[in-house]
């Protein structure tokens, strides 16, 4: 089931122009399908993700649109999985809720050149193939971030309250309580990564 909520003013603007007017927001919702696809959001800007706990893969794509694939042993029990995307002129926000927390992999395909902000309560999370700034936090579990090219980053801060930080991309590794790694270089991007309890890997 798909529903798109568009204000009358926004509809008039979209009809007259292929872009987004300042202040315009368009919201769409998908639910209960193994593949969910949304109309393209701006290819440049900031993407904010808020995803329920579980096995989550965030993957950069050459496509301008966002899409979600659900797979795993419980992929037949996804009736209450819901994804809500809100788009504006230069940013997007995606919320994913519902569904079984075990034996289900949620793969979120996003434009690879968006700055990424992501929050997940718990689980196994991976981020790959995305250039640009990254701000990713996981309360508990395993977080793996593929930085593509370490030389692209001007500032890096990575930390865990309890567990291990393995920042092999930047030549550092620390384990124990309140572990953190901070690097400053000449690249254009910023990386912030934090795990409350668990494993943080940056490669």
Question: How would you name each of these model-derived features?
Answer:
Residues 51-53, 60-64, 70-74, 98-100, ...:
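A mature extracytoplasmic/lumenal domain signature
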Residues 47-50, 118, 136, 158:
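Active-site alpha-helical segments that house and flank conserved acidic catalytic motifs
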Residues 27, 31-42, 91, 97, ...:
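Short, surface-exposed interaction patches in beta-rich subdomains
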Residues 46, 65-67, 80, 115, ...:
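Exposed beta-strand and adjacent loop surfaces of beta-rich binding modules
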Residues 81-100:
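A glycine-rich, hydrophobic loop/mini-helix early in the fold
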Residues 5-9, 18-65, 73-76, 99-109, ...:
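Short acidic/polar N-terminal linker immediately downstream of export determinants
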Residues 65-67, 88-94, 116:
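Short, hydrophobic/aromatic-rich segments at coil-to-beta transitions
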């Amino acid at each position: 089931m798909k529903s798109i909520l568009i204000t009358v003013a926004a509809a008039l603007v979209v009809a007259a122009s292929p872009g987004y007017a300042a202040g315009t927001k368009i919201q769409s919702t998908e639910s209960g399908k193994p593949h969910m696809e949304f109309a393209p959001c701006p290819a440049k800007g900031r993407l904010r993700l808020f995803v329920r706990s579980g096995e989550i893969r965030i993957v950069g794509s050459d496509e301008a649109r966002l899409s979600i694939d659900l797979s795993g042993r419980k992929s037949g029990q996804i009736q209450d999985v819901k994804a809500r995307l809100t788009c504006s002129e230069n940013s997007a926000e995606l919320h994913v809720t519902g569904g079984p927390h075990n034996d289900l992999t949620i793969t979120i395909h996003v434009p690879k050149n968006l700055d990424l902000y992501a929050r997940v309560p718990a689980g196994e999370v991976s981020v790959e193939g995305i250039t640009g700034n990254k701000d990713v936090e996981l309360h508990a579990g395993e977080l793996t971030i593929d930085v593509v090219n370490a030389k692209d980053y001007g500032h890096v801060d990575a930390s865990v309250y309890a567990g291990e930080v393995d920042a092999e991309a930047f030549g550092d590794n620390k384990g124990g309580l309140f572990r953190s790694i901070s690097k400053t270089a000449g690249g254009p991007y910023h990386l912030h990564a934090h795990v409350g309890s668990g494993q943080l890997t940056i490669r």
